[in-house]
Each structure stands twice: as C-alpha cells, then as structure tokens.
C-alpha cells in the first residue's frame, strides 16, 4: 500500500535515512502504516502488516465502515476530524466554522486545522480527540515493535506543531521505560513525492534481490 512505499522512501531519502527500525504513518483521508524492521519491510502473512488505522482505541466507540469498532481512523483521519466537527455543528454548536458549514453543508479537515490554529474551541476539541486516538495507536506500535523513529505524513501532518507537540507529549509520557527514551516522532520530509520515490526504492530493492544468474 502507499504507506509501505512511503516508509521505504523516507528510509532511503528522507527523515529515516540511516534508521533501520522505523514506522511511517499516513494521516490523511484515512490512516495507514508501513513498518521497517532491520531495514526490511514488514509485510506479515498476507501483506497487510502495519494497519494502525484499524487498531481499536475505544472498545465502546463508533463502528467504522471497515466493520471495526472505535478504530484510530474514526478519530484521527482528516475525514474523522471533519465528521466530528460536522456533527457538533449540526447540533447547533457555536464555532468559527459555522459560516463554512452553513454554506457548504460540511467542513473539511483543513478547515478544522485552520480554525484550531485560531483558537476555536470546537476545532481544538476535534484535534485533541484526534491526537489522543493517534497516540494510542502509536503506543501499540511502540510497545510491539520498539522503533527508533515514527514518521507522520499525509495531509493532517501539515498541521505541524498543532499535531506534533501534543502527540509527542502523550506518547513520551505513556511509553514504558526503555521504549520512549530514544524514540523520535517526526513529520515527513518528502511530501507528496513520497509515494513515487517509494515505488522507485521498492523496484531498486527487487532488482537487488534477483538471483545473479538472471
């Protein structure tokens, strides 16, 4: 998937250069993940390893369209952030997002991020909810995989410090001793080029692994 390509790209050319144990998480319309262990892509039995977006973080939460309950994607994706604000605005909640909602019938994740930067209470609430859920998912990765680095990419990563400062604080506070001390959580450095660069790196690795007789 795109997150698998992204982790290869960031490892080869971006934030993860020289880091062989790392996780890439894309937070955009959905939430996905790619994992490197010992410098090699972790795919699992069916090629689906790393799906942080479908980790349950609230056993009493809403049902996602994937069929799971309370998974990270419900709360932390750009779609989930927007849906939370939409529901509150539909219920009459006061917010600087009101004009956009009344005009368009909905808001976007980017609208919410912009409003949060301006101190809007509803937008900050939606972002805090997103951070808590994402942190819970990342902590599962931290305690199972013990990575050196987590790179966050996708549209929501463009929220910058609004996302990264509280996210780091929660993860570092809750990580067990021996897991968080040397862990870095960083934004992507390759931006929208991450997928195509990752595809190139995947092809390079495939060629590397071909038998010399070919």
Show which residues each predicted segment covers.
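Structural signature of FAD isoalloxazine-binding scaffolds in flavoprotein oxidoreductases
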Residues: 48-51
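A gly/ser-rich beta-alpha-beta helix-loop segment of oxidoreductase catalytic cores
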Residues: 15, 29, 37
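Short glycine-aspartate micro-motif
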Residues: 21-26, 32-34, 65, 151
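Active-site glycine-centered loops adjacent to acidic/histidine catalytic or metal-binding residues
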Residues: 2, 28, 199
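ATP-binding/phosphotransfer module of carbohydrate and carboxylate kinases, centering on a glycine-rich
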Residues: 9-19, 41, 56-214
């Amino acid at each position: 998937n795109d997150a698998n390509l992204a982790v290869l790209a960031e490892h080869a050319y971006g934030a993860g250069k020289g880091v062989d144990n790392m996780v890439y998480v894309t937070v955009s319309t959905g939430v996905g993940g790619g994992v490197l262990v010992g410098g090699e892509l972790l795919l699992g039995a069916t090629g689906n390893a790393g799906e942080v977006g479908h980790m349950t973080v609230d056993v009493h939460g809403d049902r996602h369209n994937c069929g799971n309950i309370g998974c990270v994607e419900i709360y932390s994706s750009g779609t989930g952030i927007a849906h939370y604000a939409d529901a509150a605005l539909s219920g009459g909640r006061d917010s600087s997002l009101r004009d956009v909602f009344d005009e368009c019938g909905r808001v976007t994740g980017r609208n919410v991020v912009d409003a949060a930067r301006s101190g809007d209470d509803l937008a900050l609430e939606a972002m805090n909810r997103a951070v808590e859920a994402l942190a819970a998912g990342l902590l599962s990765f931290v305690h199972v995989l013990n990575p050196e680095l987590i790179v966050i990419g996708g549209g929501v990563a463009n929220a910058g410090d609004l996302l990264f400062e509280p996210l780091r604080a929660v993860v570092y506070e809750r990580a067990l001793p021996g897991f968080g001390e040397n862990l870095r959580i960083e934004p992507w450095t390759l931006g929208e080029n991450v997928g195509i660069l990752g595809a190139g790196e995947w092809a390079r690795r495939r060629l590397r692994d071909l038998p010399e007789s070919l």
